[in-house]
């Protein structure tokens, strides 16, 4: 009977562990991208799309573009604010506005 407490990753070679780590990181990045797309869609779609047709009209396209850009701007601002609170001295030292 197999030992349930044994870590199977420990049996991998160093190169296999590195490959597994890179694969997991890649999958996590895909999940983050999918989450961002879901957030963009749930935030911007109701604001910008009236009737569903074969393609977006110019105003819908522009609205979606502006909405996503504002969404990204807000998220960047929040991340920057958090980073400044957490690592402010480092950001100031590196020359970012503080």
Curated annotation (Swiss-Prot):
It is found in: Mitochondrion inner membrane. It is a peripheral membrane protein. A motif (Twin CX3C motif) lies at residues 44-67. Disulfide bonds join 44-67, 48-63. Pfam families: zf-Tim10_DDP. Keywords: Chaperone, Disulfide bond, Membrane, Metal-binding, Mitochondrion, Mitochondrion inner membrane, Protein transport, Translocation, Transport, Zinc. It comes from the Eukaryota. One of its GO terms (cellular component) is cytosol. One of its GO terms (molecular function) is metal ion binding. One of its GO terms (biological process) is protein insertion into mitochondrial inner membrane. Heterohexamer; composed of 3 copies of TIM8 and 3 copies of TIM13, named soluble 70 kDa complex. Associates with the TIM22 complex, whose core is composed of TIM22 and TIM54. Interacts with the transmembrane regions of multi-pass transmembrane proteins in transit. The twin CX3C motif contains 4 conserved Cys residues that form 2 disulfide bonds in the mitochondrial intermembrane space. However, during the transit of TIM8 from cytoplasm into mitochondrion, the Cys residues probably coordinate zinc, thereby preventing folding and allowing its transfer across mitochondrial outer membrane. Belongs to the small Tim family. Mitochondrial intermembrane chaperone that participates in the import and insertion of some multi-pass transmembrane proteins into the mitochondrial inner membrane. Also required for the transfer of beta-barrel precursors from the TOM complex to the sorting and assembly machinery (SAM complex) of the outer membrane. Acts as a chaperone-like protein that protects the hydrophobic precursors from aggregation and guide them through the mitochondrial intermembrane space. This is Mitochondrial import inner membrane translocase subunit tim8. It comes from Schizosaccharomyces pombe (strain 972 / ATCC 24843). The lineage of its organism: Eukaryota, Fungi, Dikarya, Ascomycota, Taphrinomycotina.
């Amino acid at each position: 009977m197999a030992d349930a407490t044994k870590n199977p990753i420990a049996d991998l070679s160093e190169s296999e562990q590195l490959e597994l780590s890179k694969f997991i990181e890649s999958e996590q990045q895909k999940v983050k991208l999918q989450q961002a797309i879901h957030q963009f869609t749930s935030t911007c779609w109701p604001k910008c799309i009236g009737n569903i047709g074969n393609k977006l009209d110019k105003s819908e396209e522009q609205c979606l573009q502006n909405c996503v850009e504002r969404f990204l701007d807000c998220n960047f601002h929040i991340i920057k604010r958090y980073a400044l609170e957490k690592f402010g001295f480092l950001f100031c030292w590196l020359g970012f506005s503080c």
